[in-house]
Amino acid sequence: MRFVGHTMALPGVDIVSAIKLFSELKLDGIEIVAQEGTPFHIDLPESELYEIMEASDRYNLPIITLTPYFWHINSADHNEREKNIGGLIRAVRLAEKMGAQFVRAYGGTDSASGSEEEKFARAVDALKIAGREAEQAGITIIIENHPGTMTRTGIQTARMVHEVNMGSVKALYDPCNVLYDTDEDWLTTLTSQAGKIGYIHCKDYRIVNGERMACVVGEGIVPWLEILDRLDTKDCYLSFEYEKRWYPDQLEDAETGVPRCLDYIRRAIG
């Protein structure tokens, strides 16, 4: 298993500094949020891209994943749909340029117009288009189990990966998202996606006074020990999606919190 640091752990921190920290923490790579208003986006100037790639080489920390936020690949509005598919394709091409292996994708939004089947079919068509580009670039698009999408559950995500039916499109397994957002049990989430998982997001939460509270992995309700016992971890990428960006007051700083997560998972897999 290879361990990846996620820049969501370091809100507002420039990517070179994030690379340096994750290298010091003995991680195996970096997942970079690619969104306007953050330190990295897909229209970043060439000079800044070069600086990031040079830092990746200097600190021996590969860029593993780019994580853009193109929600509306299944929009009923043609122009909006094309804009989002185009953005995902641009992220794929940028990932290839930067030597990355994965691009995170949403499975379309569940708030799009149309029936459930129409929304699902448009998402599948969009991912086939992007998947062809990814196949040519040697990139894998990973569809996340994520709230607000057509792939909230493991069953939904597995169906979408099956319908796309391309080696360049796999599932991004996020048991924390599914446990909190849906009624699907953790074992179903895992087994339904068996053979389709290309990447893992690792995080945790607990319920305090009826409210969700982000926490260090191993201190919450996600059954990571049981999950890891059933996963084939040999060639797997596990990204610590330490959500300091969304929960700044609930999580300790990444410099101490991420190592605690890493230590827990390393001990769990022996």
Predicted regions and their residues:
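N-terminal small/glycine-rich loop or linker at the start of catalytic domains
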Residues: M1-V4, I63-N74, G107-S111
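Short glycine-enriched, charge-decorated loop/helix-capping segments at active-site entrances
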Residues: P39-I42, H78-R81, E117-E118, M213-G218, ...
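Glycine-rich, proline-tolerant flexible connector loops at the mouths of alpha/beta enzymes
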Residues: V33-M53, G107-G114
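Active-site acidic/histidine proton-transfer and metal-coordination neighborhood
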Residues: V16-S17, A55-Y59, N74-Y173, Y180, ...
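Conserved beta-strand positions in the central sheet of alpha/beta enzyme cores
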Residues: E31, T65-T67, R104, I142, ...
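Sequence/structural signature of outer-membrane beta-barrel proteins
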Residues: G37, I73, R245-Y247
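Histidine-acidic metal/acid-base catalytic patches
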Residues: M1-V4, A9-K26, D57, T151-Y173, ...
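Catalytic-core regions built around general acid/base machinery
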Residues: S47-R58, A126-E133, T189, E226-R230
